[in-house]
């Protein structure tokens, strides 16, 4: 059963985010040991795996998450999420509409990216379990990221969505997480600050301290 606290420290990662000399399996295991509360498999960009290689990797990482009782979410790829029976799916504004697949994801976690009021007003949140708001800060992890909206956008959208869980995303690091923790966000989505940390487990511990 999905709860807002599952968003506390939400790790998003694919092979494209892993520094040289490391593997995604190593990094994810260390992040799980550190206490991440949710993991999203986002395999896209230069050098990302495709086809059966992507499926095989997803299954391997899914099993790792299961051993730590951490939900495994697939970014964007509805077919993959169905094929491996993932715990949920996260889609953006330009991806497949939630209305098109929600009936195939009953009992699963559905997340939607929302960057501003216009996107919120254009979105049907009937079947959405949480929204990802951002980019809060400038982000190096997404080539297609739009302009940063700042922590204030969380409060702007909170007034509109009530108790719907909100996770902040985009450029979040240990240097700026305190600004997000002061808002009504239920947690933070983090890519590079965890994936590229020389001390992954310790970094996750530090993020968790802001969302107890």
From Swiss-Prot:
Belongs to the thiamine-phosphate synthase family. Keywords: Magnesium, Metal-binding, Thiamine biosynthesis, Transferase. NCBIfam families: thiE. GO terms for molecular function: magnesium ion binding; thiamine-phosphate diphosphorylase activity. Pfam families: TMP-TENI (PF02581). Mg(2+) binds at residues 76, 95. The lineage of its organism: Bacteria, Bacillati, Bacillota, Bacilli, Bacillales. Its EC number is 2.5.1.3. It catalyses: 2-[(2R,5Z)-2-carboxy-4-methylthiazol-5(2H)-ylidene]ethyl phosphate + 4-amino-2-methyl-5-(diphosphooxymethyl)pyrimidine + 2 H(+) = thiamine phosphate + CO2 + diphosphate; 2-(2-carboxy-4-methylthiazol-5-yl)ethyl phosphate + 4-amino-2-methyl-5-(diphosphooxymethyl)pyrimidine + 2 H(+) = thiamine phosphate + CO2 + diphosphate; 4-methyl-5-(2-phosphooxyethyl)-thiazole + 4-amino-2-methyl-5-(diphosphooxymethyl)pyrimidine + H(+) = thiamine phosphate + diphosphate. This is Thiamine-phosphate synthase. Condenses 4-methyl-5-(beta-hydroxyethyl)thiazole monophosphate (THZ-P) and 2-methyl-4-amino-5-hydroxymethyl pyrimidine pyrophosphate (HMP-PP) to form thiamine monophosphate (TMP). The keyword Cytoplasm does not apply. It comes from the Bacteria. The keyword Magnesium applies. Pathway: Cofactor biosynthesis; thiamine diphosphate biosynthesis; thiamine phosphate from 4-amino-2-methyl-5-diphosphomethylpyrimidine and 4-methyl-5-(2-phosphoethyl)-thiazole: step 1/1. It is an enzyme of class 2 (transferase). Its cofactor is Mg(2+). 2-[(2R,5Z)-2-carboxy-4-methylthiazol-5(2H)-ylidene]ethyl phosphate binds at residues 139-141, 171, 191-192. Binds 1 Mg(2+) ion per subunit. GO terms for cellular component: cytoplasm. 4-amino-2-methyl-5-(diphosphooxymethyl)pyrimidine binds at residues 40-44, 75, 113, 142. SUPFAM superfamilies: Thiamin phosphate synthase (SSF51391). One of its GO terms (biological process) is thiamine biosynthetic process.
